[in-house]
């Protein structure tokens, strides 16, 4: 399979959206099933999770069916925290998936720090401090600041 065929396959089977949906399903199920998730990784705010397609790869293993891997990079508040791999058959059927976070101590600190920034942003916006100033103080994205402002208004 050449790269053009792989790109056509990717578009034909709506793989990007299916992989993104698969990530959210996996994460939601993990959060529900693992009572220690928030303790291990902190209370993640889904608004701060971003996904980026990193790789699409055709794989041929002898004595096994060919398959295609799609790797999504996971970012939390613009910091890389892990990857999500979804595996598909050549017919475009879901085969398997796995979510892998990097060092959970780093993620927990990042999540807690970000949550503190969100609390500061909420308080600052309630006091009438302009969005741009809150963005500079907290390091949060302008879209999140606007979302917080709508929530508290």
Stretch-by-stretch model annotation:
Residues 114-153:
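Elongated, amphipathic alpha-helical interaction scaffolds
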Residues 53-59, 112-119:
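Short, positively charged, low-complexity/disordered linker segments
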Residues 2-4, 110, 150-153:
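Short acidic DE-rich linear segments
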Residues 1-39:
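N-terminal trafficking/processing presequences and adjacent post-cleavage segments
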């Amino acid at each position: 399979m050449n790269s053009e065929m792989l790109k056509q396959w990717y578009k034909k089977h709506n793989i990007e959206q299916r992989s993104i949906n698969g990530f959210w399903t996996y994460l939601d199920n993990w959060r529900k099933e693992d009572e220690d998730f928030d303790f291990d990784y902190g209370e993640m705010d889904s608004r701060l999770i971003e996904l980026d397609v990193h790789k699409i790869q055709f794989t041929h293993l002898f004595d096994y069916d060919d398959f295609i891997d799609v790797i999504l990079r996971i970012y939390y508040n613009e910091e890389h925290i892990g990857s999500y791999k979804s595996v598909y058959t050549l017919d475009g059927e879901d085969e398997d998936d796995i979510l892998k976070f990097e060092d959970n101590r780093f993620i927990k600190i990042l999540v807690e720090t970000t949550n503190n920034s969100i609390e500061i942003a909420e308080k600052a916006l309630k006091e009438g401090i302009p969005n741009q100033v809150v963005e500079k103080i907290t390091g949060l994205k302008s879209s999140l600041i606007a979302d917080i402002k709508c929530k508290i208004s």
